[in-house]
């Protein structure tokens, strides 16, 4: 039987080496993709590259700060030199500042919007141009349930993810005639460092799990599975969609 999730030697750019980006890079590499992983944090890059090597795969890495348009475009150019023109793109760059609206500083807003939304636009535009030229591409953004739900103390993050959801839909509409699909995965509460930091600050794990119909937190690998599906040709007729990987969180 043919493996419809194979990504044999497909040039793949993954931006963001944290929990979800790193897990997705490993999943894509395991399916045969030729992965370049880009992040500002060298320790994260090294950890994912080691994990890939231990599993018998290779992930090339590139350290880059993605807070300006010029830096994003330069990172794409350099990453293409590592893998070739991308057929798969994943944006998993982001941060969250948890503060009430009245306590937010200007830099909290600017930094969160820049990393979560502006970098998605700059990188998506640069990679999209290459995909449209070649009339093929699988583009995936990591959104969040916060793009739909009104979580207190999440205003910049929610604005960024909500904006991302509309932005990628426009990309999907414009690029569909060129064989480029554009989708997003929207995780709920996942076992990542961000969630660990939240719980370490005295928040109750059981109360968090009680908000999820599945009654548990998700795992990075479960988000990575959704990313891998959307990167494959099995998802060739799916575009402009948000795939919620949240154990039912948006249902309640």
Q: Language model features by range: what are they?
A:
Residues 100-101, 105-113, 208:
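Substrate-binding pocket helix/loop in short-chain dehydrogenase/reductase
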Residues 3-36:
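Canonical Rossmann dinucleotide-binding motif of NAD(H)/NADP(H)-dependent dehydrogenases/reductases
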Residues 144:
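Residue(s) in the substrate-gating loop at a strand-loop-helix junction
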Residues 1-3, 149, 228, 239-252:
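Short C-terminal tail/terminal secondary-structure segment
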């Amino acid at each position: 039987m043919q493996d419809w999730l194979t990504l044999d030697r497909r040039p793949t750019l993954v931006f963001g080496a944290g929990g979800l980006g790193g897990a997705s890079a490993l999943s894509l590499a395991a399916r045969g993709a030729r992965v370049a992983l880009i992040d500002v944090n060298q320790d994260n890059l090294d950890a994912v590259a080691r994990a890939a090597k231990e599993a018998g795969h290779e992930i090339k890495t590139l350290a880059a700060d993605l807070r300006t348009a010029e830096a994003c475009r330069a990172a794409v150019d350099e990453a293409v030199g590592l893998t070739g023109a991308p057929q798969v793109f994943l944006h998993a760059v982001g941060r969250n500042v948890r503060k009430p609206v009245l306590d937010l500083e200007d830099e909290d807003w600017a930094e969160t919007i820049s990393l979560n939304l502006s970098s998605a636009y700059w990188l998506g535009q640069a990679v999209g141009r290459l995909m449209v030229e070649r009339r093929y591409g699988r583009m995936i953004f990591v959104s969040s349930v916060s793009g739909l739900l009104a979580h207190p103390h999440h205003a910049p993050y929610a604005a960024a993810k909500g904006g991302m959801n509309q932005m990628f839909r426009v990309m999907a509409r414009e690029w569909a005639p060129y064989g480029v699909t554009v989708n997003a995965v929207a995780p709920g509460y996942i076992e990542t460092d961000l969630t660990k930091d939240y719980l370490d600050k005295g928040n109750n794990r059981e109360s968090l799990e009680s908000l999820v119909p599945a009654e548990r937190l998700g795992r990075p690998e479960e988000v990575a599975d959704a990313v891998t599906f959307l990167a494959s040709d099995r998802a060739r007729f799916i575009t402009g969609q948000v795939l919620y990987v949240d154990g039912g969180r948006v249902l309640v």
